[in-house]
């Protein structure tokens, strides 16, 4: 009985972290907003560090709704892409090798994205986590929630529908 040789866990983690960093780095708007992602297994948590440039209403002050909406959409798209990349990396083969070289599948295209602003986004760091509700060959549905100090006090949530690309690399 021949079993495939298992890689050390640290090598697998480093390869996944490198792939995530390349994926995030390939999108200029993510860099513009300063959004970064923390990976724990296959789960991503997005972080948008506070910046004065994010303030939309200086009298409150409050984070601009456009920045909040963009943060939610970025988080949803990255979760959807990461679920695709994760699966391809786990399956191995040519797709996994292409990802290691920095070649990713095309990004899904947004069909619609509905944001619910539940409370004021305060002038502090924001966090978000998305969940892929359904991902098929042609269509995907993703829900995302954002919070600041307390994960139970969501300040915005969104649901997005995406047109899935051809997943071949």
Show where each model-derived region lies.
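Catalytic strand-loop segment that frames the active site of acyl-thioester-processing enzymes
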Residues: 33-63
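Hydrophobic residues in beta-strands and at strand termini
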Residues: 48-50, 117, 164
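A generic structural signal for short beta-strands and their flanking turns/coil linkers
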Residues: 33, 42-44, 109-113, 124, ...
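Hydrophobic beta-strand-centered segment that forms part of the acyl-chain substrate-binding groove
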Residues: 77-127, 132
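Active-site-proximal helix-loop elements at catalytic-domain edges
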Residues: 18-36
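HotDog/MaoC-like acyl-thioester-processing domains
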Residues: 2-14, 78-81, 119-169
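Short Pro/Gly-enriched beta-strand edge/turn motifs at strand-loop
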Residues: 15-22, 112, 126
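Compact, glycine-rich, soluble single-domain proteins
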Residues: 59-78
